[in-house]
């Protein structure tokens, strides 16, 4: 038993030999005439005479076709005759060249077309990769940078991607300094008002003692009344001076007083007393303003405790948390 590969090899070899023999038989006539297989003697005189006769026949044919009326017309029969005549006169080398070209041209076309498509695809891939990398560079921001781009205060302002302390701005710093100055001024005014109330309490106690002495000594009523009038005049003059000072301070700093109108009104109401005392002096009314005095240094600020913030808003510059 022979192996299958050996049978296949013998069959392919025999087929190739048969093809070569068939090609040799078909081309032998042309090859023998040209002298490729066996060199033979050539009679050049016979060749020249044959060429002359051929030229004469061609000239006669052209003259006859020119004399015919339908010589200018073209038909498929004439075309076929011309092609067959020219193909019969071709050399065998031209036949081989035509066969090779007919086999090689489609292969070369497909190879070149495939290379061109691969180059175009490579260029497209390179362009796509460059575009993707550029988009990644443009979109590669962290949370803080995206927050600056999304939640910027003003589009005309430049975008600052570096770190910047946004806890206290310049305008807020000026506002806080003004607020501290106004608070210090209000505390100084409240202290002055408290000192004035304390001095008036002492003055009221002194007046009460003098009234008791006047009741015990009926003989010195006239002297006591003169002393009371003098003390009333002194207290009224001191109150007028204090009120004039308060008015000057209020006109000197209208901004600080306009921010806290409630506190100033409460201070004025607590420190204001009647200029002239008529009749009996109520010591409880004198002592009452000191206990009801309400001092408010800064206004209350409302806070929203229900706010929910994500990471981009937490990193954003316009917000403070």
Curated annotation (Swiss-Prot):
Polar residues compositional bias, start-end: 184-194
Cellular component, GO annotation: nuclear outer membrane
Spans annotated as Disordered: 174-194, 210-275, 299-321
Primary localisation category: nucleus
Composition skew (Low complexity), residue ranges: 263-272
Record localization: Nucleus outer membrane
Signal peptide range: 1-22
Biological processes per GO annotation: autophagy
Region (OSH1-binding): 139-195
Biased composition annotated in UniProt, kind: Basic and acidic residues: 174-183, 242-262
Sites of Phosphoserine modification: 156, 199, 285, 298
Annotated membrane topology: Single-pass membrane protein
Keyword Protein biosynthesis: no
Top-rank taxon: Eukaryota
Region (TSC13-binding): 73-125
Keywords noted in UniProt: Autophagy, Membrane, Nucleus, Phosphoprotein, Signal, Transmembrane, Transmembrane helix
Subunit structure: Interacts with OSH1, TSC13 and VAC8.
Function according to Swiss-Prot or TrEMBL: Involved in the formation of nucleus-vacuole (NV) junctions during piecemeal microautophagy of the nucleus (PMN). NV junctions are interorganelle interfaces mediated by NVJ1 in the nuclear envelope and VAC8 on the vacuole membrane. Together, NVJ1 and VAC8 form Velcro-like patches through which teardrop-like portions of the nucleus are pinched off into the vacuolar lumen and degraded by the PMN process. Also acts as an outer-nuclear membrane receptor for OSH1 and TSC13.
Name under which the protein is recorded: Nucleus-vacuole junction protein 1
Organism: Saccharomyces cerevisiae (strain YJM789)
High-level lineage: Eukaryota, Fungi, Dikarya, Ascomycota, Saccharomycotina
